[in-house]
Amino acid sequence: QVLDYAILVINGADGVQGHTRTLWRLLKLYQVPVFLFINKMDQPGADKEALLWEIKEHLDSNCIDFTQERNEGFYEEAAMCEEAAMEKFLSEGSLASNDLAQMIAKRELFPCYFGSALKVQGVEELLDGLYEYSRTPKYPDKFGAKIFKIAREEQGNRLTYLKVTGGTLHVKDMLHGKAGEEEWAEKVNQLRIYSGEKYEAVSEAAAGTICAVTGLTKT
């Protein structure tokens, strides 16, 4: 519920598995736009055409090979995913990057990239695609946040994980909420940006930032 986009990684040697379909259903449930990276294409038995057919068959027929971008037939195949895009393609013969970006954001199109993370093959193309076809949401100036996880670290500190959905959150800000009929107000002691188990303490978190907050007991 806090994701702007998701990257779904599929093992090219194994193809679409049960857990792949489970993740796909969850992403559909929460309407998260998806980029797909089919990994381990350097392994024996990894067949790109067969994998793409399997992905279209078991996930969505609008999963398109973006490694063939700008090749003959690419824009026509992409345009077939959405009626307005097809009308533009028929009149202009192509689609703009923004057209594709809008289709991806609306889950009408799912870009597929193929490669090997271990050998750093296809990774740059994926990153280029994310840069070109993802769009940063417009956030309001008024502060807002969505809490998605509560945890405790080894020292016992209670961590409230949230995404800032508007404005900016600062250390020492007072947050207000309601638990049942009881209204509460608590101070932000610390803001942490996590990367794995490590974190960086920051003084503020702008809209779009995912962070962990200490000092809250009522969330």
Residue ranges and their predicted role:
Residues 1-219:
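Structural and coupling elements of P-loop NTPases
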